[in-house]
Structures are given as C-alpha cells and as structure tokens.
Design a protein with these regions (language model features):
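Small-residue-enriched hydrophobic alpha-helices in membranes
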Residues: 1-100, 104-238
C-alpha cells in the first residue's frame, strides 16, 4: 500500500461475500460454533475506494465467535454433537454384530452389551430392545422365516459371508466414517468393547472372532493390532 501522511492513496483490499452459514467444530474455540462460508475478491483501492478487481482471495470458513478463518476442509470435521452420535451408533452396531455372531442366549453377554450401549449414549437401552432388534434383523434377512420373536442359539455366523450381507454393510457404514476422526487409541477402544461382549460368557467363538476381525478392518486397524487387542482382552480378568 502507498501511504502519504497516514492517508492510504493506493492499495489492495479484500471484499468478502457470505455464501452460506451453519455449525461446525472451531479448532480455535475448541467447540461447536456457528460459521459463515465466505468468498473473497481482491480489489485495487484508490483513496480507500475499491475499484478494479485483482483476482479471487478464495473461499474461507469464518467462525462467528472468534472470527478465525479456515479453509473449507474445516467443515469435514464433525461437530461434537455429530461425533457423539457417530460413536454411539458405532458401539451399538458392534454390540449387535457380536451378539448376532455369538448367539443371544448368554445373559452375561447381553448385560455387557447393554452396558456398553448405554455408556455410549443410548441411556434407555434395554435387553428387550436389543433382542427385539436382533430378531427383526433376522426376520428381514429372510434366513430364518418367522423368527421375529426369537434368535437361533448359534447366532448368524453365516451372515458374515460376502460383502453384501447386512452385517458387513452395517459395520462399514457405522465404523469407517468414524475411524477417520478417531485416534488409534479410540479405534482400539471400540474394538475392545466388542471383545468384552464376546468374552462375557466364555472364550471367543469362531464366529465372534470373525466379527471382531471385521470390526478391526472397518476401523482401519491392521490384522496384527486386532489380534493383539483380542488376545490382551482374553487375558484380562472380567
């Protein structure tokens, strides 16, 4: 800029235009805040008046509280509300998957699953709700006609076969988006919760190991880490 006696004769100013707004996670504030999505245009100014355009200043996301500006990629980070819901759904899906693989006759496994789901955020979850949902899944799958009121004791291990199975789809949809926002310790903790459900009524069944292996893959864990976590859980007294 060109100044003479404190007066700006010539310079460049960025003019911002708001294109949208919403809620996002502001790293500067450390929580959920409102934002404005803004696009800037640089203009040549003479005596403080914007005249000729000098190109685009790009698009930014501006926090309405701290005014900090970030790139549009800041909107890819889920808000704490959305993240909590993703984590809650993930634990719920893992609990259902483990119960499905191991059968639902073990009371200890059912109680451990209910406790995990409640801790994750479904505070009013009951055994009857979990069993009802499992029975509905079985009936919808069509593998056990008329099974809306009960589950086979050996679970649905065969539902794991093939990427088109309901179990594979549910695990991928619930875990893969979440894994991108979890630290390694967080991904391991989700797997560990599933392991504790499986171990609540005895050693791992083959189908339970298969399910937990699928959980680990959906969370982005390598096979060695998944095996290490499962073995460590098996050695830990309940």
């Amino acid at each position: 800029m060109l100044h003479i006696k404190g007066l700006c004769l010539l310079g460049v100013r960025t003019v911002w235009h708001t294109e949208g707004d919403g809620e996002f996670f502001c790293a500067g504030c450390g929580g959920d805040r409102g934002y404005r999505r803004r696009t800037g245009t640089r203009r040549l100014t003479v005596l403080g008046l914007p005249l000729l355009p000098r190109g685009s200043a790009g698009t930014v996301v501006e926090c309405v509280v701290c005014r900090a500006r970030s790139g549009p990629e800041a909107l890819e980070q889920p808000t704490t509300t959305v993240f909590s819901a993703m984590l809650r759904d993930a634990v719920h899906t893992v609990a259902l998957a483990v119960l499905t693989a191991g059968g639902s006759t073990g009371r200890a496994a059912r109680e451990t699953a209910v406790e995990a789901v409640r801790t994750a955020g479904f505070t009013d979850c009951t055994e009857d709700q979990l069993l009802g949902l499992l029975a509905a899944i079985v009936a919808d799958e069509g593998r056990f006609p008329g099974a809306a009121g009960s589950l086979p004791a050996d679970g649905l291990a065969d539902s794991l076969d093939g990427c088109g199975s309901w179990l594979s789809i549910e695990l991928h949809e619930a875990l893969e988006p979440l894994s991108r926002h979890l630290a390694p310790q967080g991904r391991e903790r989700v797997l560990l919760q599933g392991a504790r459900i499986a171990l609540a009524d005895g050693p791992y069944l083959p189908a339970e190991r298969e399910v937990l292996g699928a959980v680990g893959r959906c969370l982005g864990l390598v096979g060695e880490d998944t095996a290490r976590i499962l073995e460590a859980a098996a050695r830990t007294p309940s």
